[in-house]
Regions:
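Conserved FAD-binding catalytic core of PHBH/FMO-like flavoproteins
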Residues: 125, 130-164, 169
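A Rossmann-like FAD-binding core segment of flavoenzymes
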Residues: 66-87, 93-94, 100-102, 163-250, ...
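FAD-site-proximal beta/loop scaffold in flavoenzymes
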Residues: 117, 123-139, 229-278, 286, ...
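FAD-binding core/adjacent interface of flavoenzyme oxidoreductases
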Residues: 1-8, 76-143, 251-255, 259
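A conserved FAD-binding loop/helix module that cradles the flavin
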Residues: 157, 267-311
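Redox-cofactor binding/interface segments in oxidoreductases and associated redox assembly factors
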Residues: 10, 103, 107-108, 147-148, ...
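Beta1-alpha1 glycine-rich phosphate/pyrophosphate-binding loop at the start
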Residues: 5-63, 68, 152-177
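Glycine/Thr-rich phosphate-binding loops of Rossmann-like dinucleotide-binding domains
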Residues: 41, 115-116, 155-156, 222, ...
Length: 327
């Protein structure tokens, strides 16, 4: 693809789409490149996104966001970006299908939630396998929940779920517990059962969990799983161009979402922000405003802003007598 864009956004989730919308409305030449694999796509129903009181499927939310951005002349391309490099004063982006160049780049590639080691569990993602208590606990009130994990975070999840249901089990899935003494005491105090044996199989109907089968041969009826196995931020592109990461592998940004590389920005779940769709969208807007301001200031420095049609007579070369005249 020829020509240097003002902005290229890598990632088509909520952060990328929100940034695209703002940049399009700022009349910036913007290209959004996405791989079609946003985690939001797999959410069967998003209930905590403002403006959708009846909920909305994650895929529908992405489709609406794309349609809205395209209205403001944002171009969208489906490609898998393989590398980002600095080339002079611009960035060179190599995709699997095409190459691209831009003055500014926003990385909004998100992360991948790691599913638990349970056969067949991936078919339950977004329907009865969940990764975020703040996102999904409300819909599971009174249901039978199993939290799969072995650390303090897993215990915190189990304790937090007691606000929504008393039917909570903590499953180690064949691993050794690593939580501290305080957390062990809370498990005992609140009488949360802990199962250590591995989960060998699950039964579901179109992604809706029905039963779990444990290594000892017992089966337990369950309605949903939460896992605290962890996440993998998609930050490799930022590393390749020299951006700094934190200890969790997330891209370090400042309050304007600037990375340690001038001209390179990051937003959404690939940064240390709380990974929520509405927060990602807000970060996308912040990054877009920062990028727009950055480009504006560069235009001022280089004297490349569009010229006014109503320039003063002195600007046209007429004598300047110090008076302002109106016609």
């Amino acid at each position: 693809m020829t020509g240097v864009r003002e902005v290229i956004i890598i990632g088509g989730g909520l952060a990328g789409l929100s940034a695209a919308l703002y940049l399009g409305r700022s009349r910036r030449d913007t290209l959004l490149i996405h791989s079609g694999r946003s985690m939001a796509k797999w959410e069967a129903e998003v209930q905590n996104y403002l403006g959708f009181p009846d909920g909305i499927a994650g895929a529908d939310l992405l489709d609406r966001g794309t349609e809205q951005a395209v209205r403001f002349k944002v171009e969208v391309a489906e490609d898998e970006v393989q590398s980002v490099m600095i080339k002079g004063e611009t960035f060179h982006i190599q995709g699997r299908q095409c190459s691209y160049d831009a003055k500014r780049v926003l990385i909004a590639t998100g992360l991948t939630h790691l599913p638990p080691d349970v056969p067949g569990v991936k078919e339950c993602v977004g329907k009865s396998l969940f990764f975020c208590k703040d996102c999904d606990a409300y819909r599971l009130q009174g249901q039978r929940l199993v939290i799969i994990g072995r650390n303090n975070e897993a215990v915190d999840y189990a304790l937090g779920m007691l606000l929504f249901t008393s039917r909570v089990t903590l499953a180690l899935n064949g691993k050794e517990a690593s939580w501290d003494q305080d957390h062990a005491g809370w498990l005992e105090e609140y009488q949360i059962p802990v199962r250590q044996d591995a989960i060998l199989a699950l039964e579901h109907e179109e992604g809706r969990l029905r039963t779990l089968t444990f290594a000892r041969g017992e089966s337990a009826q369950m309605d949903a799983i939460f896992t605290t196995r962890g996440d993998v931020p998609h930050s490799a592109l930022a590393v390749g161009v020299g951006a700094l990461l934190d200890a969790e592998g997330q891209i370090i940004v400042d309050e304007r979402l600037r990375t340690s590389v001038p001209g390179l920005y990051a937003a959404g779940c690939v940064t240390p922000a709380n990974c929520q769709m509405i927060i990602a969208a807000g970060q996308g807007a912040i990054a877009a405003q920062a990028i727009n301001r950055d480009l504006f200031e560069e235009s001022l420095r280089r004297h490349t802003l569009p010229r006014s049609e109503n320039r003063s007579s002195s600007a046209r070369g007429a004598p300047d007598d110090g008076e302002t005249r109106f016609s």
